[in-house]
Amino acid sequence: MSLKVQNPNNVRVYTVSGEGVTQRLPNWISKRKLKKDYALSHRIELLQDFEYPEASNRIKCTRDGKYAMATGVYKPHIKVFDFAEMSLKFERHTDAENVQFEILSDDWTKSVHLQTDRTVDFHSQGGIHYSTRIPKYGRDLKYHYPNCDLYLAAAGDEVYRLNLEQGRFLNPLKIESAQIDSPTGGVNVIDINPMHQLLAFGTDAGSVEFWDPRDRSRVGILEIPSTVPSTPYSDNSRSVTALKYRNDGLNVAIGLSDGATLLYDLRSSSPYMSKDQGYSMPIKSLHWMDSALDGTARVLSADSKIIKIWEKDTGKPFSSIEPTVELNDVCPIEGTGLILTANEGSPMHAFYIPSLNPAPRWCSFLDNITEEMEENPAPTIYDDYKFVTKKELLNLGLDHLVGTGVIRAYMHGFFIDNNLYEKARLIANPFSYEEHRQKIVKERLEKQRASKIRSQNRPKVNAGLASRLSYQENKLRKKTGVTDGPSILEDERFKNVFTDKEFEVDEDTLEYKQLHPSRSEARGLTAAEESEEEKEHTKGIKFSSDEESLSDMEEENETFDALVDRRKTEQQVSNEKTPQETIRSTPSGMEMTFKVEKKKKSKPVNRDEDSTSGKKKQVTQGRRSASKNVFRNM
């Protein structure tokens, strides 16, 4: 499955429907055969039956954005497409070919059609509601919603008014600038400003008249200035063939018969931008496009050969679409990147530009499948041949083959088969294989070197700070999803922090360790903390000097015999028992060592058999026997 893609100005334009994408299938073909056909089973069909037997004339979308209405031949009929179902809703045949139509309701149920036989057909949900005729052949029509007037432009200097509320024709508007002496003179196009309802009529004489619908009077007339350059292939008469107001109420685009597009501000009589299509063909369609991706205001201008999209303020080209058939009408779906066209040829076309706007909601899958379905360039016949000049052919020693079927002359050289070229090159230059081998080895070595992990150039000053900042940046980028962006290490404002020694951070200072305790080492005790620790360790412990003073006081009150007995007892205890603990003073504080005394396990105390704590054997005396055999225990 593949899509045709164009890449003008590095902007991808996908053809999602039309010539080469949607294939017409005969009615008699079997569905079983379709399953075996890879191309047909993997084709894309954005809208079912999006085609006409011969050609399509006009196409428009409804205001609710759910339907599209198109007219075409042959036989003349109307088609309505349902976007939600992506298929044809219905088709309705008419008596004459359509010139222009207008959708009156928000959906497709009410519409008015101007036909080539001067008839005006009103269509409702059930069919043709009413049909009437105008005196001259019509060229365009517009519906004015506030007063229910239908304006019909035709040949001559009159614009007919048909009031749909009263159901009758009103006095027509007299357009003085229209050329009534010319057989083709008249009013070509009509447009109504969506903001203040100002009427604009483009004439065949190359002028635009502005009318106020409230009092039906002309406000002003705009003549095409002579300073606007014309193409050398255009005639002297330049007529207005397209008109389009912008939604802001101030800007209007005017398309001329020689392929020029002029942008005007209603407050000025001179254009602030002009653009030429380049084909000297009349402009058939103009549209204002606002991009939701970059917010740029653009203009779409189309003639029968090409569709151009360019910026409103600068005229810079954005993209262009050049279909294989002639265009009749263009309908971009508002707020999206999808463009529908009515054209000569059976299939109507649909183009999708992802960089302009996203896909419509009813075909949002286009955003995902366009790149996957993009067609791969097919190899051409020249891929198997090598182009060489006559001098290169002499160096290879193949000049004697000129004129044979092996070498084919082309422009200033020759086409030669690739295999023959390689063999001749090896014979003419035996060392070419060794050069080729060295080249391959060099490329592989460079590829391996590129794949190795290279050490990053760490700054000489504050290397630790730089590594921590880069780690935090990478962590933040993974969290936010932003892969590219300016790094703080490359910021000119903080450049001196990583290059100048004056900004170096000393991580060994006490202040830095207090601010970063997780990276600082364990510090020593202060003098106050050491004194408090000594008090805690020495609390409750009697030193040898205290014991001696107490013993001296006791010795004064004891008799000699009692003192001798007590000394003997202390000596025996000191000989039998080693000291349990030793306390000594060190520069870092008090230190105490002790030994845990091992105690012998005490033997269990023998208990009397009659005690209630336990019995060695069961006592059966005085108890009732469970068996009737009284001699069992005898």
Swiss-Prot record:
Point to the regions of Acidic residues compositional bias: 546-559
Q: Which GO terms describe its biological process?
A: maturation of SSU-rRNA from tricistronic rRNA transcript (SSU-rRNA, 5.8S rRNA, LSU-rRNA)
Q: Where in the cell is it found?
A: Nucleus, Nucleolus
Q: Where are the WD repeats?
A: 51-91, 182-221, 235-274, 278-320
Ranges annotated as biased composition (Polar residues):
571-588, 619-634
Q: Keywords for this entry?
A: Nucleus, Phosphoprotein, Repeat, Ribosome biogenesis, rRNA processing, WD repeat
Q: Name one GO cellular component term.
A: small-subunit processome
- Where are residues bearing Phosphoserine located in the sequence? 531
Give the InterPro entries listed for this entry. Answer: Beta-prop_NOL10_N, NOL10/Enp2, NOL10_2nd, NUC153, WD40/YVTN_repeat-like_dom_sf, WD40_repeat_dom_sf, WD40_rpt
Task: Specify where the region named Disordered lies, as residue ranges.
Answer: 513-634
Q: According to the UniProt entry, which residue ranges have a biased composition of type Basic and acidic residues?
A: 513-522
**Where is this protein chiefly located?**
nucleus
Query: Which Pfam families does UniProt cross-reference here?
Result: Beta-prop_NOL10_N (PF23098), NOL10_2nd (PF23097), NUC153 (PF08159)
Q: Which SUPFAM superfamilies match?
A: WD40 repeat-like
Question: What does the UniProt record say this protein does?
Answer: May be involved in rRNA-processing and ribosome biosynthesis.
The record's subunit annotation is: Component of the 90S pre-ribosomes.
Similarity comment: family membership: Belongs to the WD repeat NOL10/ENP2 family.
Protein name according to UniProt:
Ribosome biogenesis protein enp2 homolog
- What is the native source organism of this protein? Schizosaccharomyces pombe (strain 972 / ATCC 24843)
